[in-house]
Amino acid sequence: DSIASISQCLIDNGINAKCIYGAVPLEERLQLIEDFRSGKYDVLLTNPHTLAESVSLHSVCHDAIYYEYSYNLVHLLQSKDRIHRLGLPDGQYTQYYYFQNWYDYNEKAYSLDANIYQRLSDKERIMLDAIDNQHLEAVCTPEEDLELIFGEL
């Protein structure tokens, strides 16, 4: 629903957008990706699950906006790699934007999105530290992760 709603909003505002999500057949996905690469439309709406692997957009796309994201670090990292590659020209930018909805809960600002993003950032730091130090650390159990995300509720 989110992808379709955002797409319709963009189209209503004169922005040529197309969508790829789980129900889009493979042949159609491939055509939509090729059309995006060739500039036939301005915005490609998708999600990290759908285009997590084997799609390179780095030659034509340098901005990613995450309206929703999964709690899976691998999905996020693979998704970010769709528009960023080693060897990009000097001065080439790549930007990532992360929407975060905030709500008043018990007279306090709360954002599930911000909490999930923070946990993803923590997981990425732990992963990079493990690679740099060649030492694996104990990480949170799924139950502890849930407590970190939902503990304020």
Whereabouts are the PLM-identified features?
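Helicase motor interdomain insertion/brace
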Residues: 1-13, 129-130
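Structured helix-beta-strand junction loops
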Residues: 13, 39-40, 60, 82, ...
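SF2 helicase motor core recognition
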Residues: 3-8, 29-30, 44-68, 72-93
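Conserved RecA-like P-loop NTPase ATPase core
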Residues: 36, 57, 120
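Conserved helicase ATPase core of P-loop NTP-dependent helicases/translocases
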Residues: 4, 14-51
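A conserved SF2-helicase RecA2
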Residues: 71-153
